[in-house]
From Swiss-Prot:
Modified residues (N6-carboxylysine): K191
Protein name: Ribulose bisphosphate carboxylase large chain
Organism: Eucommia ulmoides (Hardy rubber tree)
UniProt keywords, alphabetically: Calvin cycle, Carbon dioxide fixation, Chloroplast, Disulfide bond, Lyase, Magnesium, Metal-binding, Methylation, Monooxygenase, Oxidoreductase, Photorespiration, Photosynthesis, Plastid
UniProt-recorded Gene Ontology molecular function terms: magnesium ion binding; monooxygenase activity; ribulose-bisphosphate carboxylase activity
Post-translational modification: The disulfide bond which can form in the large chain dimeric partners within the hexadecamer appears to be associated with oxidative stress and protein turnover.
Reactions accelerated catalytically: 2 (2R)-3-phosphoglycerate + 2 H(+) = D-ribulose 1,5-bisphosphate + CO2 + H2O; D-ribulose 1,5-bisphosphate + O2 = 2-phosphoglycolate + (2R)-3-phosphoglycerate + 2 H(+)
Protein location: Plastid, Chloroplast
GO biological process terms on file: photorespiration; reductive pentose-phosphate cycle
């Protein structure tokens, strides 16, 4: 019969160290911690098998297909330096295993099942190489960085934002007032907090109306294009699209979505709607730390970032390197480049395991947000460069004189940093001096400098190589 029942070692079929990877393969780098007594080759092969064609025992229907054509292969294993019993297992998946244009299906296949596997003590997906043959089946970001700049008519500097706080409990009218003050003071964007959806104290439609009013008023008074990220995240996809439609009817420039809690299917639907209707799409990564914070188990954020670029979003939160939230500098800049650039070289010192060629997929603006204030401005300008959104929530609304002066302080600080950089000054070394000079001409900035002169969030970064 050619069929032998029973349980076989995975490595007989799925560990293939002499395999030459194809240009069309999806490649994955897993950090594997095998259970005691399980050899690394067997653990790596088990991951390849369980995330592709394998199951725990030989089945006769294997004979009805070509395993060689469809199986995932563990083609290389290396020990992780400085860690006991941790290995990087490289797995190649044939392109045919995945549905075109579906991030949902890609994740269901690659990480859907293997993470509960008994032979592994822990498993983390560190990186994915998405071949152009697959990325070309995705629309990607609704607009991308250049189109966004053209829509907003803002060039040569990072964009400024502010999350409206307190995040929960304001009425729609008071919320709109805070939006107006921030935009009037000089910010480009204000933002719904990720958990502002449609609660009893502020229903979504009321918020959309008051925010649109605030936006148009600030626009008329400043002569600059303004935006407020209206959070369209909802309990059903239909309701989410309904909110996006209403935002479009109001004529506002941008909506927002929580892509991990909302889910990739909903996110991709919204991204398609946004491109078809000229809306920018801001993405918040609520829930990411549940998935990406543990060093030895889960999925690294650089994979979630790549997935978002495929699913679609024009902005995504990406850590600050300097504020209250997670992010080690080189690693953060690694996935910031993966979001913005067309082509990123493999660079293990930045956590990038594969060379990634995005071809013509539009880029995503990284958003730095969380515990940042005016004293951070030189560092942020230097680290993130022009193509970024810098968001100061408390760093705007916490200003002793109010929201609009808080916005003024941030705008003055940003313009000072950009100007100093363009004159060739070293922001890393002279940053504090640049802010102090600017504060002489701006009482709002001087007051902000005084309030936050001693604030530090000093904890070691968790996201290390």
């Amino acid at each position: 019969v050619g069929f032998k029942a029973g349980v076989k070692d995975y490595k007989l079929n799925y560990y293939t160290p002499d395999y030459e990877t194809k240009d069309t393969d999806i490649l994955a780098a897993f950090r594997v911690t095998p259970q005691p007594g399980v050899p690394p080759e067997e653990a790596g092969a088990a991951v390849a098998a369980e995330s592709s064609t394998g199951t725990w025992t030989a089945v006769w229907t294997d004979g009805l297909t070509s395993l060689d054509r469809y199986k995932g292969r563990c083609y290389h294993i290396e020990p992780v330096a400085g860690e006991e019993n941790q290995y990087i297992a490289y797995v190649a998946y044939p392109l045919d295993l995945f549905e075109e244009g579906s991030v949902t299906n890609m994740f269901t296949s690659i990480v859907g099942n293997v993470f509960g596997f008994k032979a592994l003590r822990a498993l983390r997906l560190e990186d994915l190489r998405i071949p152009p043959a697959y990325s070309k089946t995705f629309q990607g970001p609704p607009h991308g960085i250049q189109v966004e700049r053209d829509k907003l008519n803002k060039y040569g500097r990072p964009l400024l934002g502010c999350t409206i706080k307190p995040k929960l409990g304001l009425s729609a009218k008071n919320y709109g007032r805070a939006v107006y003050e921030c935009l009037r003071g000089g910010l480009d964007f204000t933002k719904d907090d990720e958990n502002v959806n449609s609660q009893p104290f502020m229903r979504w439609r009321d918020r959309f109306l008051f925010c649109a009013e605030a936006l148009y008023k600030a626009q008329a008074e400043t002569g600059e294009i303004k935006g407020h990220y209206l959070n369209a995240t909802a309990g059903t996809c239909e309701e989410m699209i309904k909110r996006a439609v209403f935002a479009r009817e109001l004529g506002v420039p941008i909506v927002m979505h929580d892509y991990l809690t909302g889910g990739f299917t909903a996110n991709t639907s919204l991204a398609h709607y946004c491109r078809d209707n000229g809306l920018l799409l801001h993405i918040h990564r609520a829930m990411h730390a549940v998935i990406d914070r543990q060093k030895n188990h889960g999925i690294h954020f650089r994979v979630l970032a790549k997935a978002l670029r495929m699913s679609g979003g024009d902005h995504i939160h990406a850590g600050t390197v300097v504020g209250k939230l997670e992010g080690e500098r080189d690693i953060t800049l690694g996935f910031v480049d993966l979001l913005r650039d067309d082509f990123v070289e493999k660079d293990r010192s930045r956590g990038i395991y594969f060379t990634q060629d995005w071809v013509s997929l539009p880029g995503v603006l990284p958003v730095a947000s969380g515990g940042i204030h005016v004293w951070h401005m030189p560092a942020l300008t230097e680290i993130f460069g022009d193509d970024s959104v810098l968001q100061f929530g408390g760093g705007t609304l916490g200003h002793p004189w109010g929201n609009a002066p808080g916005a003024v302080a941030n705008r003055v600080a940003l313009e000072a940093c950009v100007r100093a950089r363009n004159e060739g000054r070293d922001l890393a070394r002279e940053g504090n001096e640049i802010i102090r000079e600017a504060a002489k001409w701006s009482p709002e900035l001087a007051a902000a400098c005084e309030v936050w002169k001693a604030i530090k969030f000093e904890f070691p970064a968790m996201d290390t190589l």
